[in-house]
Amino acid sequence: MHRVSRALVVASVLAGVALGSPSVHAQAKGAPVNSSFAPVPAPILQGKKAFISFELGDVSSFPSTYSGGPERAYNEFYQGMQQWGRYQLVADPKDADVIFAIRFVDSPGLSHPQIRLGIMDPHGAIALWGFAEEINAAVRKKNRDASFSATITQVVSDVQQLLATGGGPAQP
C-alpha cells in the first residue's frame, strides 16, 4: 500500500512539472514551437510584382463537396491578395518578382483537404517558401464552403505574417 501511495505522489509531481512547464503551456495556447526565424528569401520581401498561378489540384470534390469549380482556390486567393495590395498582381509570370502557386488538395491519404501555396522565384523556378492549411470538416455544404473560404483567408494571412516577421513591410 505504501508503494502505491509513493508511486501516486511521484506521478503527481511529474505531471505537475510537465503541466507547469512553459513549453507545454505555449503549445497548448497555440504558440509556435519554433521561436527562432530563418531569414525570408529576398524576392518575397523585396518583390513588388507577383504572378498568381493556378495549379490544378484534385477536382473530384467539385461541385459535390464544395461550391464552385477547381479554380475556386485561385479566384479567392487572387481576390485576397488584390485586397491586401502589397504586391502589384501581373498577368504574365515574366513580369513578376515572385510567383504564388495556389492549389486545392484532397488526397485519400489526408485526414482533411488542404489549400497549399508555393512561393517561387520566377527566374529560376526555385521554391522559396510554402504553406499548407487544412480545411475544417463540416457536414453541411454551406458550412464546408465557409470553411474553404476561411482557409483561403488564412493562407493570405500566412503570407502577410511571413512578410511581417521577415523584416519586410506588412503594408506598402
Q: PLM features: what roles do these ranges have?
A:
Residues 1-12:
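Bacterial N-terminal signal peptides that target proteins for export
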Residues 11, 18, 42-44, 81, ...:
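A generic structural signal for short, solvent-exposed coil/turn residues
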Residues 15-25:
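C-terminal segment of classical bacterial N-terminal signal peptides
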Residues 26-50, 77, 122-172:
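C-terminal/domain-edge helix-coil "capping" segments
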Residues 28, 82-88, 93-146:
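Surface-exposed short loop/turn segments
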Residues 28-32, 55-72, 110-111, 147-154:
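Glycine- and small hydrophobic-rich membrane-insertion segments that are intrinsically disordered
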Residues 46-101:
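N-terminal segment of the mature soluble domain
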